[in-house]
Curated annotation (Swiss-Prot):
A GO biological process held by the record: protein folding
Biased composition (Polar residues): 1-11
Lineage summary: Bacteria, Pseudomonadati, Pseudomonadota, Gammaproteobacteria, Cellvibrionales
Family statement: Belongs to the GrpE family.
PANTHER family documented for this protein: GRPE PROTEIN, GRPE PROTEIN HOMOLOG, MITOCHONDRIAL
Organism listed in the record: Teredinibacter turnerae (strain ATCC 39867 / T7901)
Stated role: Participates actively in the response to hyperosmotic and heat shock by preventing the aggregation of stress-denatured proteins, in association with DnaK and GrpE. It is the nucleotide exchange factor for DnaK and may function as a thermosensor. Unfolded proteins bind initially to DnaJ; upon interaction with the DnaJ-bound protein, DnaK hydrolyzes its bound ATP, resulting in the formation of a stable complex. GrpE releases ADP from DnaK; ATP binding to DnaK triggers the release of the substrate protein, thus completing the reaction cycle.
Pfam families: GrpE
Subcellular locations according to the entry: Cytoplasm
Biased composition (Acidic residues): 13-28
Keyword vocabulary terms for this entry: Chaperone, Cytoplasm, Stress response
Name assigned to this protein: Protein GrpE
C-alpha cells in the first residue's frame, strides 16, 4: 500500500491525536505515581507502626531490667541482714551454756570439776557449730611450716624436730570453707 492509500489526517485531527496521546500518557503516569505514592505511604505507616512497637518493647524491657535489678538488690540486702541467722541460732545455746558455767563457778562451794566439764562440753558444742558452718581449726603442731596457713612467731633450735617444723602453737588458726580467716601463730624449729 502506498502513502497515498493511508487516510490523511488533517492538521487539527493530528493535533487532537497528539493531545489525546499526551493526556493518556499523563493519566497513566498519574495513576502509576498515585499507586507508587499509596505504596510508599503504606510502607511508611507500616514502618512507623514497627517503630512504635519497638519503642514499647524497649520500654518494657527497660522496666523489666529495673525490676530485676531492684529485686536482686533486695535479695542481697536480705542476705546481708539475715545470712547469719542460722549461725546465730546455733551460737545461742553456746552462749547460754557459758552463762550457766559462770553462774556455777560463782556459786559458793562450787565443784570445779563440774564447772570444767561444763565448759569443756560448751567448747565442744561451739566447735561443732562452727564446723557445721564451714569453719575448721588449723592446729599444725608437728606439721611442716606452711606460710599460707601459719604465722611464725619465733624459730628455735630443737634437735628432736626436723627443721622448719611447727613445734608449738600459740594460737590456733581458722579457715572458712577453705579460705584462711586467721593464721595459726606458731613456733618453728630451725
Amino acid at each position: 500500500m502506498s502513502n497515498q492509500d493511508e487516510p490523511q489526517n488533517s492538521p487539527e485531527e493530528f493535533a487532537e491525536d497528539q493531545q489525546a496521546d499526551v493526556a493518556l500518557e499523563e493519566a497513566s503516569s498519574d495513576s502509576s505515581e498515585t499507586a507508587a505514592d499509596v505504596d510508599l505511604v503504606a510502607r511508611i505507616e507500616a514502618l512507623e507502626a514497627e517503630l512504635t512497637e519497638a519503642k514499647e518493647q524497649a520500654l518494657r524491657a527497660a522496666a523489666e531490667m529495673h525490676n530485676v535489678r531492684r529485686r536482686a538488690e533486695q535479695d542481697v540486702e536480705k542476705a546481708h541482714k539475715f545470712g547469719l541467722e542460722k549461725f546465730v541460732s546455733d551460737m545461742l545455746p553456746v552462749a547460754d551454756n557459758l552463762g550457766r558455767a559462770l553462774e556455777a563457778a560463782a556459786a559458793e562451794g562450787a565443784d570445779m570439776t563440774a564447772v570444767t566439764e561444763g565448759v569443756d562440753l560448751t567448747l565442744k558444742s561451739l566447735m561443732d557449730s562452727l564446723k557445721k558452718h564451714g569453719v575448721e581449726s588449723v592446729n599444725p603442731e608437728g606439721e611442716p611450716f606452711n606460710p599460707e596457713l601459719h604465722q611464725a612467731m619465733t624459730a628455735v633450735e630443737n634437735p628432736d624436730a626436723e627443721p622448719n617444723t611447727v613445734i608449738n602453737v600459740y594460737q590456733v588458726g581458722y579457715t572458712l570453707h577453705g579460705r584462711l580467716v586467721r593464721p595459726a601463730m606458731v613456733v618453728v624449729s630451725k
